[in-house]
């Protein structure tokens, strides 16, 4: 039922409550704890309501449903190991609980219901996922820097050491480790040397300041994690029974304030801000004005007019981010006085945990879309490198064939054009022309022609002689290129599609490779081209299912397995 607490959260509450009661300050029989344990071990879960608690005198309402099952109330329901619904008697039989239902003794009812276990149980699950997503966001930011051909100095330890914040230092060190020795970074440095003005001197904020953005969020998540860790190991019912002094202490450990505060901080500050960064990075990656040569919308097909790539995904990301920002409002400032003003202040801890769980789900969807987009960008860089190599070889071949010799076999002045022609290929972004490489309206042919015209203008009096004129070679050069280049480009594409590229994918020797390998090989996702029946949503679904099942943890950790936890030494 949509009005029932998820069974995983109910089971977490049972475990946390057992942990609290085992500490011996709650006045409850050990046999009751054994019964709850048997229910857990036999995968029998009481049905708890989704709503109805303010986590003030603990989570009274949902915890009473566990007590109701233990005492055999006729309306008590549980869910069995195969999802079947059962009454209390069947649950006891299946769990092997002997002796019948419990008749509660003094204090035992309060011991069961007067505590924060439901809120803190759900909060602990939420924070586990949030910690994983925080590390994933660091890793994905580093991969983003690679595919964007970013400048790696943004991770230099001195910059972050001077800022003093530990979360920022950690985020930068993680990214620095992934980028250290990256062939993508080395290739980007060569491009910057070829044409220093081709891209901005400094990368945009979503890349360059990602450690500064993520750093405080990591610290917030760590603080919240520590608060919930303390809460799930605390004694939080009332009154407390101090056997050593023969006292019943009437206090107030039952409010879930640590839950509400930690969940609000995690939701409002951390999760929403991580999502905002992912959206900013995603928007930059799909925009060909910013992404340093990748195709608009990361289209991978031969015909960009028929392949909209990640355009729909970008719209979806805007939707996810908007919903996430809406959820990023604190819950604890909406407290209402309750129980005839006895519970006049309360925590709303479980409500905050539920809303944070919703936010985590949205961030999972955003992480899915972002990860698939990065894998697409990695493959497009591989395609770009192979196609540029093909174009360069073809231009060189045609230049040698057409421009080297004159009509009578003599060396021709146009032979000196080849070097400048190849510089054009090096500087021009492949995806600005590759769908129709010989089109006169695309930049490649225009700039190749301009090189020949410039050389012709410098040829002086030799231009007046048809046997030494460079200008008269332009037509032959272009015609030869139009015959050869489209065939060579298509041949290179087919080799890529058949897994036999001339240049292997650089990602295979990178530290980020385990994540790429998991998405591409283990989950079986493919490059999106618009040429196949499968839709982007099918690829996203594979990754989202894996993230929700916790399968992304191992490959994410594998990316960092060689990291010693410290920044690279300054040198």
UniProtKB/Swiss-Prot annotation:
Location of the protein in the cell: Cytoplasm
Family to which the UniProt record says this protein belongs: Belongs to the PAL/histidase family.
Modified residues (2,3-didehydroalanine (Ser)): 57
CDD domains for the chain: PAL-HAL
GO MF term (any one): phenylalanine ammonia-lyase activity
Disulfide bridge positions per record: none
Gene, per the UniProt record: PALG4
Alphabetized SUPFAM superfamilies for the sequence: L-aspartase-like (SSF48557)
Pathway: Phenylpropanoid metabolism; trans-cinnamate biosynthesis; trans-cinnamate from L-phenylalanine: step 1/1
Residues reported to bind (E)-cinnamate: 114, 202, 208, 238, 311, 339, 342
EC number in record: 4.3.1.24
Keyword annotations: Cytoplasm, Lyase, Phenylalanine catabolism, Phenylpropanoid metabolism
Highest taxon of the lineage: Eukaryota
Cross-link (5-imidazolinone (Ala-Gly)): 56-58
Family matches, as InterPro entries: Aromatic_Lyase, Fumarase/histidase_N, L-Aspartase-like, Phe/His_NH3-lyase_AS, Phe_NH3-lyase, Phe_NH3-lyase_shielding_dom_sf
Protein name: Phenylalanine ammonia-lyase G4
Subunit structure: Homotetramer.
An example Gene Ontology biological process: cinnamic acid biosynthetic process
One term under GO cellular component: cytoplasm
The organism of origin for this protein: Populus kitakamiensis
Free-text description of this protein's post-translational modifications in UniProt: Contains an active site 4-methylidene-imidazol-5-one (MIO), which is formed autocatalytically by cyclization and dehydration of residues Ala-Ser-Gly.
Catalytic activity: L-phenylalanine = (E)-cinnamate + NH4(+)
Major localization listed first in the record, in broad terms: cytoplasm
Physiological role: This is a key enzyme of plant metabolism catalyzing the first reaction in the biosynthesis from L-phenylalanine of a wide variety of natural products based on the phenylpropane skeleton.
Record carries keyword Cytoplasm: yes
């Amino acid at each position: 039922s949509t009005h029932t607490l998820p069974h995983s959260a109910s089971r977490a509450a049972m475990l946390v409550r057992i942990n609290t009661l085992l500490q011996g300050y709650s006045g409850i029989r050990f046999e009751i704890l054994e019964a709850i344990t048997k229910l857990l071990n036999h995968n029998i879960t009481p049905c708890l309501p989704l709503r109805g608690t303010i986590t003030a005198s603990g989570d009274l309402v949902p915890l009473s449903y566990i007590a109701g099952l233990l005492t055999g109330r006729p309306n008590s329901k549980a869910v069995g190991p195969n999802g079947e619904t059962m009454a209390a008697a069947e649950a006891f039989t299946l769990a092997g609980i002997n002796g019948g239902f419990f008749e509660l003794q003094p204090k035992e009812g309060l011991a069961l219901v007067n505590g924060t276990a439901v809120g803190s149980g759900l909060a602990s699950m939420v924070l586990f996922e949030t910690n994983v997503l925080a590390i994933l966001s660091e890793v994905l930011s580093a991969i983003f820097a690679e595919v964007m051909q970013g400048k790696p100095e943004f991770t230099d330890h001195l910059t972050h050491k001077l800022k003093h914040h530990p979360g920022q230092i950690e985020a930068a060190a993680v990214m620095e480790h992934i980028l250290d020795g990256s062939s993508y970074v080395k290739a980007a440095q060569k491009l910057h040397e070829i044409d220093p003005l081709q891209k901005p001197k400094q990368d945009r904020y979503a890349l360059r300041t990602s450690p500064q953005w993520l750093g405080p969020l990591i610290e917030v998540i760590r603080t919240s994690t520590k608060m919930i860790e303390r809460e799930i190991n605390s004694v939080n019912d009332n009154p407390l029974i101090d056997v050593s002094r023969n006292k019943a202490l009437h206090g107030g450990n039952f409010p879930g304030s640590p839950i509400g505060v930690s969940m609000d901080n995690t939701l409002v500050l951390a999760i929403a801000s991580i999502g905002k960064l992912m959206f900013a990075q995603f928007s930059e990656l799909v925009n060909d004005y910013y992404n340093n040569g990748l195709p608009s919308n990361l289209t991978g097909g031969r015909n960009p007019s028929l392949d909209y790539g990640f355009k729909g995904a970008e719209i979806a990301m805007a939707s996810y981010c908007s919903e996430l920002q809406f959820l990023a409002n604190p819950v604890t400032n909406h407290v209402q006085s309750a129980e005839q003003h006895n519970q006049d202040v309360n925590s709303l801890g479980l409500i905050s945990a539920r809303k944070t769980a919703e936010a985590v789900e949205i961030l999972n969807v955003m992480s899915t879309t972002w990860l698939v987009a990065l894998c697409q960008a990695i493959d497009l860089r591989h395609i770009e490198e192979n196609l540029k190599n093909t174009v360069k070889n073809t231009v060189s071949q045609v230049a040698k064939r057409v421009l080297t010799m004159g009509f009578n076999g003599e060396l021709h002045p146009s032979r000196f054009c080849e070097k400048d022609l190849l510089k054009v290929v090096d500087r021009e972004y492949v995806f600005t022309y590759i769908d129709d490489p010989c089109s006169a309206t695309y930049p490649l042919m225009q700039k190749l022609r301009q090189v020949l015209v410039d050389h012709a203008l410098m040829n002086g009096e030799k231009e007046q002689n048809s046997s030494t004129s460079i200008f008269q070679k332009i037509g032959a050069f272009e015609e030869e290129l139009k015959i050869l280049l489209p065939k060579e480009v298509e041949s290179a594409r087919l080799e890529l599609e058949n897994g036999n590229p001339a240049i292997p994918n650089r990602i295979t020797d990178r530290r980020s490779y385990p994540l790429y390998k998991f998405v591409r090989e283990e989950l079986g996702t493919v490059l999106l081209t618009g040429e196949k029946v499968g839709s982007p949503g099918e690829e996203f679904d594979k990754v989202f299912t894996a993230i929700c099942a916790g399968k992304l943890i191992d490959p994410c950790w594998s990316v960092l397995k060689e990291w010693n936890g410290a920044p690279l030494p300054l040198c």
